[in-house]
Regions:
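Glycan-recognition and catalytic cores of secretory/periplasmic carbohydrate-active enzymes
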Residues: 1-375, 379-414
């Protein structure tokens, strides 16, 4: 990290520091990967915003302000560059802090990915940049992670507004250059799907961030492996608003199907070792998306290292660990800006269970009142509370909270 220019000096970093010159050894493998050989790895890239999750972990464990301050400073630097670039996060920053410094003609460095003869803007270059393979996904995906981490630490709406501006640009088509005939070269990547934009609404609960939900009809998605959670996340939002009451059962059925399907892939695997490395996340039979949505009130975090941003987290005080106690089920069925509704049930026929309910995955929210469907509200002014469930008993709770009012911590609530 270069504090003077507020950049990470390379896209490839390790114990020996930043790698400023790519070699064949760095990009070895099939032809699909070796087209990167000789491309410039010097300077910063939006992909490095994923490093904020590493620093967030350090803050969550230590509570040292220097880690929080670094995430805010580094992320704000990228927001400043995006603002100066029409709210498009540039794909590269040179070692001198200037955008586009080491990518004078991205079209020459990525033949085949842009129309021949195009004049691509230097800011659109970069490893996994706008003008390269998959840039429409890698750039905003990494930006999304950095902005979410900064929002988790601060609750400052500017981070969500910056994400919204970039995603709306993608929806309309990001202009990254011009063809010889003067027509623009645009990137949108099929953004009618807008699968990244869902975080905007789920984190803020602001109606203006539902533009990606236009004309959505609940239940129309088909279970598959390549949807990035787009369909079921939209259906989950519909369920939370009362439009799709069958969602929990359908989602559970889908999750079981996915686990069975992936176990079958493992049992019948004929792939090569080098192929298997890239396919691990598609073959993992552990399926957590249904549990994240329906018990935590959280969208499943991305495989890139994103933190969980949700309403609730559970702990078992008897075993001294995180998670729901044995035989205890939880179902979040409604959320708004300041409240979450959850039903807790003890399925055991002979054992009483105690579950500690925390506001936020990392205690980033403050509890206000808690009320059962048939009871009076109780003022808590804390970050967690305990519920004792008798055998075969359950209760629905409305939990009021002031969201993102506390600094996130990985500490358990005892």
């Amino acid at each position: 990290y270069d504090p003077e220019h507020n950049i990470i000096r390379s896209v490839m970093n390790g114990s020996a520091g930043p790698n400023l010159d790519a070699t064949m050894e760095d990009w070895g493998g099939s032809d699909f990967f070796t087209h990167w050989v000789g491309k410039n790895v010097r300077g910063d890239t939006p992909l490095n915003l994923q490093a904020t999750s590493l620093v967030l972990t350090a803050f969550g464990l230590s509570q040292e302000a220097k880690y929080r301050d670094w995430i805010i400073k580094y992320t704000d630097g990228w927001i400043d560059r995006a603002r100066e670039n029409g709210w498009n996060f540039p794909g590269n920053v040179g070692l001198n802090g200037k955008v586009g410094e080491d990518w004078p003609n991205p079209a020459e460095q990525f033949p085949g990915y842009v129309p021949e003869g195009s004049d691509i803007y230097p800011w659109a270059g970069g490893i996994m940049g706008w003008s390269g393979w998959g840039g429409w996904g890698f750039v905003p995906g990494s930006v999304r992670m950095g902005l979410k981490n900064a929002y988790l630490l601060t609750g400052d709406e500017k981070y969500m507004r910056a994400m919204d501006r970039q995603l709306q640009n993608l929806r309309d088509g990001v202009k990254i250059g011009e063809r010889k005939n003067g027509r623009p070269v645009k990137v949108n990547g099929g953004w009618q799907r807008a699968w990244m934009a869902m975080d905007l609404y789920l984190i803020t609960m602001r109606p203006e961030y539902t533009w990606y939900m236009k004309d959505w009809k609940p239940g129309r998605w088909q279970p598959g492996e390549g949807t990035y959670g787009m369909g079921w996340t939209r259906d989950w939002i519909a369920y939370l608003s009362g439009r799709y009451p069958e969602f929990p059962e359908n989602m559970l059925d889908w999750a079981l199907q996915r686990t069975r399907r992936r176990i079958a892939k493992i049992e019948n695997d004929e792939s090569k070792d080098w192929e298997r490395k890239a396919e691990l996340r598609h073959n993992n039979p552990v399926t957590t998306c249904a549990l994240s949505m329906l018990t935590l009130g959280a969208r499943e975090p991305s495989w890139r290292g994103s933190p969980v941003i949700g309403r609730l987290r559970y702990f078992d005080p008897e075993r001294g660990c995180a998670g729901l106690p044995p035989n205890v089920g939880a179902l979040v069925d409604k959320m708004d800006d300041n409240n979450v509704w959850v039903t807790l049930v003890n399925l055991s026929e002979d054992a009483t269970r105690t579950v500690v309910v925390q506001a936020g995955a990392y205690a980033e929210h403050s509890l206000g009142t808690v009320q059962t469907d048939d009871g009076e509200p109780r003022e808590l002014n804390d970050q967690a509370f305990a519920v004792v469930l008798r055998p075969g008993c359950g209760q629905r709770f409305r939990i009021e909270m002031d969201r993102f009012a506390q600094r996130p911590s990985f500490a358990f609530p005892w």
